[in-house]
Amino acid sequence: MSLTSIIRPFFVRRTNRLERYATQAEEVQRQVLARLVGRAENTLWGKEHHYADISNYEQFAEKVPISTYEELKGYIDRMRHGESDILWPGTVKWYAKSSGTTNDKSKFIPVSRDGLHDTHYAGGTDCVSLYLRNNPKSRLFDGRALILGGSHAPNYNLPHSLVGDLSAILIENINPLVNVVRTPPKRVALLSDFEEKRDRIAEIASKQNVTNLSGVPSWMMAVLNRTLEITGKSSIDQVWPNLEVFFHGGVAFTPYREQYRQLIKSEGMHYMETYNASEGFFGLQDDPSDVAMMLMIDYGVFFEFIPLEEVDRKDAVAVPLWGVEKGRNYAIVISTTCGLWRYQIGDTVKFTSTNPYKFVISGRTKSFINAFGEELIVDNAEKGLAEACQKTGAVVSEYTAAPVFMDAEGRCRHQWVIEFEKAPQDLKTFATLLDEALQRINSDYEAKRYKSLTLQALEIIPARRNLFNDWLKSRGKLGGQHKVPRLANNRDIIDQVLALNTNEG
């Protein structure tokens, strides 16, 4: 009997509970909110916002303000210095480091023991549960899980307190039983130098029977390419013939899909998207034929949503899950067992179903171009690129885009820097196809492009090989959960990238 067949029944039981998501979502979410408020009643935050007087969602929304990291930073700083009962009961020892705000280089997101187990590890368990449900012939546990993570460091030298990539915190605290099927060893998985880690992982894992991969697509690709270099093989399935699934998240998979098809040629390879962030684990692709993910509503996270067009208004009103509409872009607001209260995480989603609640990630609240009223979001960009690639045979590795507000001739346009894995034969044709696709996808963009009166045709600047990796490396962000910002409404990032494009880093 295989190890997978022995373990499978444990995971099957969980999938039965997920059926509540379709019929009892509001009830489940109200229960989550009640538990959150009850647990935090005697914290500093709970006392300041009169949690003892809150008995329903309406009172919660009235008494607790919508917050950003800047507004919670003072509380989090106190927690990082060892104070207890601030945003969540007890002392929080772990902090997930993520990209910063306008005022800070980095954000430090608290990860409580409750959040670690009830949210992050629950998400990993359900991910496997749904995969096994959809693939009854899977031999997932009969080999190794290659889990790619970041690194961590001591937090203010407090005993047993860590700060670093969420993935590193998860690996550090993982159930020892998981180590039986996980690779690489912890000492390698947590190396801080990504290039050394990449090489060590490739050397170790290439000699093992790897059946599944977990990580960010961009960084996993670096490991896979290095594995091919070391082994001399032409495809990953020659190295790991039993490889069957890649659990991926962190960035949109669309730009990488074709590259993975070239790397892993097995027709039996599966890809399963997850929506896990420093702030929590929010969604899973439960149906391999549907790109939308199911919102995970019983992980100790209470969800609210702000219509995207209202997100920058001081009087913006959030709606609970049961108040959302299909097809509308929303900014996510969460309250969690990690002590984040009505917290804007910066991501935007669009619901494709409300029975159960399923969604696609449409972008970031600060990752868009709206310099001329065109309201271009990441979802538009990903779809436009996919269409242009499909028509030209090109493969995009990385990209970023930003506005050119006015050039020497008084013209405004969008400027794209694109690193191609496989370049199109004619870059101008590719640019035209991308521009036309964006006009079909986004009516505001189409209106601004009308006769080029407001917005000229977009410009594409090809990036030299490894440009974006070099840019991340120059900022100390190579590896881990760091990613290239896709769109920006200013030129800060694109100008840095272009400066590096003139040399070899």
Language model features with spans:
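Conserved structural elements of the adenylate-forming
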Residues: 111-133
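Active-site glycine/GP-rich loop and adjacent strand/helix microenvironment
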Residues: 1-52, 59-67, 74-82, 161, ...
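Conserved AMP-binding loop of ANL adenylate-forming enzymes
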Residues: 129-178
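Alpha-helix N-cap/helix-initiation motif
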Residues: 84-88, 109-117, 370, 374
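Accessory carbohydrate-recognition regions in carbohydrate-active enzymes
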Residues: 36, 55-56, 68, 114-120
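Short, solvent-exposed loop/turn and secondary-structure capping segments
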Residues: 109-110, 158-159, 225
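Conserved pre-ATP/AMP-binding loop-to-beta segment of ANL
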Residues: 80-97
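Conserved adenylation A10 loop of the ANL superfamily
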Residues: 95-109
